Amino acid sequence: DRPKALGDIRGVSYVYPLMWRFGVLRVPEIVEKNMSLTLEFGFFRDLKEAETMNQLMRTTPEEMGLHSQNILNLLERLEKENISVVSMMLLRHNQVLYKAYWPPYTQEQLRTVYSLSKTFTAMAIGIAAGEGKIRLDERIVDLFPEQAKNAPDSPQLQMLTIRHLLMMSTGQGNEPFHQENAWDDAISAFLREPFADAPGETFRYNTGATYMLSAALKQRGIDLEEYLRDKLLTPMGITGTRWIRDPNGICTGGFGFSLH
């Protein structure tokens, strides 16, 4: 009995910045409109507090004191500017006001989250640290002694820790994976990269640093994807995942994660 509308609108994956830009975030309300998308308004008033995403209570914008016209304006603006949207879900006070998937995308499809993969990797490190399986002050050369033997020795490399990888403050001057054939042995490629600063001094975006977090977990016998699935995703009701792996079977960490 949930009202649905099908349509053919084009939109954006990063909707929230657009909502801010268009002034909609001040009043995030929803509308059911016969456009090029599938809308789902739920009416589960009697659900207890949700334990997973699939159990979140559904409601209507007006029941939360909001005006649907604001979201209608956003959808029309997205269509007018020919901006591609894959899906959108809005919540207020832990209740779903609006949920939509733009054809041909559906809720069942795995979607690649690109560099948001880094956030999931960092969460896995946090969980592992909380369980005592890894320490933030552990030195990288101690985690990878064999590869470190063949890397150019430097004071910076000796200082480098898990914490520096998390902060993207490795001190390396460039992205390590620009090297030819780097993915044949990505750990060694990372350790070979020259330093420009001492670790902890300067932030530089570094996908290789997040890969090394995944590799560090692997050194402890922990597969990143399986660990996240067990500790975080399955308890949240997220059951479908896939992560790109390097030739040695290590999840890429900084990219390549897909989930429902």
Task: Describe the role of every protein-language-model region.
Residues 1-39:
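Intrinsically disordered, charged low-complexity linkers and terminal tails
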Residues 40-52:
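Short, Lys/Arg-enriched N-terminal segments with co-localized hydrophobic residues
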Residues 53-60:
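Short, contiguous pre-domain boundary segments
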Residues 72-106, 136:
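A short, well-structured edge-of-sheet supersecondary motif
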Residues 94, 111-137, 165, 212-217:
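Active-site SXXK
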Residues 112, 131-170, 192, 219-257:
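Active-site helix/loop module of the DD-peptidase/beta-lactamase fold
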Residues 182-199, 209, 216-217:
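Amphipathic alpha-helical interface segments
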Residues 212-216, 255-260:
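Active-site-proximal alpha-helical segments within enzyme catalytic domains
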